[in-house]
Each structure stands twice: as structure tokens, then as C-alpha cells.
Amino acid sequence: LEFRRVLFRSLSLPMVVLTAILFFIGVFVSWNIEKAPKGYFALLLLLDTGIVGVFLSLDFFLFYVFWEVMLLPMYFLIGMWGGPQREYAAIKFFLYTLVGSVMMLIAILALYFTCGHTFDMITIMETASTNLVGVSWWGMDAIKVIWVLLFIGFAIKVPVFPFHTWLPLAHVEAPTAISVILAGILLKLGAYGLLRVNYSMLPDAVWWFAGAMAILGLINVIWGALCALAQTDLKKLVAYSSINHMGYAMIGMAAVIAAGEMNG
């Protein structure tokens, strides 16, 4: 139990520090915003609240609430202060993220009802694997179904191929400060969620999907690099390079499982 609490802190602390630094920079980058500056900075602070809340929550209900709190500020920041295609970019981001949120909500409710009607992440971590042993839904292992639902929810945020198409447009159309936050923090939230939820709570299912994660990560690396090479727009270049970088993160997470197998 204590190790897992330390694990949460070790994962969360550097991300909270990174969030504070990038939002501090984002405020200065946005200092010359002329269109509704009060609304802009209010949404920026609300986005900051959602991100920090996700990193610090040990309750699944709060984790999900803060995850959703991030959605609306990003939608309005892109849709109101973005570039020429800002509305299309904002709607595409909203729809992709909404689909992931629905998947995550179904998985969270499934864990709630199978783990003693609790949202406490430590308790779920300790009981999920035991309570889900032998449980089948639609002819499939319940633990695998829940793992896949959570994976899709987080993979859209990473983003993992083929859920990556919202990122280049959102990155290009977003204001510069939001592009910095998008590349610097928001994409990492997906990888953070995979480590904190999928890996920590459902470790038995990870063994089944490590190979698929490695393949998806490899596709991200190759596709992101090739697309980045073809870009002339700096923001698009950063967007595709971010897809490439997160592919390495996916491969790294899969490699942890492979290393565990080799070491017994």
C-alpha cells in the first residue's frame, strides 16, 4: 500500500511541477491577448485546475471530474481564440475527447460495482484483479474489457494511432500558449493515465496487451516522424513530432512488461 502511494507521488510530483512551469510561461505568452482577456485567463486557470486535479486525485470520481473539467476550457480556448479553422478544430477535439470520456466512464462504473462500491483508487488497485477473476462479459474476460475501455480513453489523449487526427489541427489552430500546454502537458496526461490506472489497477491484463501497445507505439514513431519531415508549418511540425515522441513512451511502457517477463 505504501509503495503504491509513493508511486502515485513519484508520478504526480514532476507532472505538477511541469504544469506550474508551463502555465506560468503560458500566462506571459498570452499577456497581449486583446479579445475578452478576462474570459481567456479564467478559462486558462480552469484548465490548470483540471490538469492538477487529475495528477493529484486518489479518488476515481474526482479523477474523472477533473478529467472532464479540462475538456470545456480547451474547447473554448481553441474555438474562440484560435486561428481561421478554430471552430472545426475545437469541435473535432471535443468529439474525440468525449468518446474517450464515455469509454472511461463505463470502465470506472464497472470497477465501482465490482470492487465494493468504492471510488478509492488504492482500494480498487488492491481488489480489482481478485474481484474480476473468472468474470465474463459477452464471452470475454471482464478485466480485459475494462482494460481496453480505459486504454481507448487514455489513448485518444496520448494520442495513439489511429486516434491522432485531432491533434495536428488543434495544435495549429490553438493560440500559441495553448499549443505549448497541449504539447507539453495534455498529451502526457494520456500516458500518465495508462501508468496510473491500467498498469497499477489492472496489471494482469497488461500482459495480454503489451505487444499491441508496442506495435501502436511503433506506428506512432514512424508515422509521426514521416509526417513531421513533410511539414513547413512549425506548429504542425511540433504536433507530428509530439505524436512521434509519445510513440516512444508507448514502446517504453510495453518494454517494461517484456523486461518483467525476462526477469521472471
Predicted regions and their residues:
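Helix-loop junctions at the membrane interface of multi-pass solute transporters
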Residues: F28-A36, Y75-P84, I152, F161-H171, ...
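Structural signature of hydrophobic alpha-helical transmembrane segments
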Residues: S10-T19, F60-P73, I143-I156, D204-I219
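Juxtamembrane/interfacial segments at transmembrane-helix boundaries in multi-pass membrane proteins
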Residues: L1-R5, V102-H164, L169, L194-A212, ...
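Hydrophobic residues within membrane-embedded alpha-helical segments of Major Facilitator Superfamily
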Residues: M15, L22, L46, G53, ...
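Transmembrane helix-loop-helix hairpins at membrane boundaries of multipass inner-membrane proteins
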Residues: L1-L44, H117-G134
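Central hydrophobic cores of alpha-helical transmembrane segments in multi-pass inner-membrane proteins
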Residues: V16-S30, L47-T49, M70-M80, L149, ...
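Alpha-helical multi-pass transmembrane bundles of energy-transducing inner-membrane proteins
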Residues: G39, L43-L46, G50-V133, W138, ...
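The feature identifies polytopic integral membrane transport proteins across all domains of life
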Residues: K38, L58-F61, A89-F94, A142-F151, ...
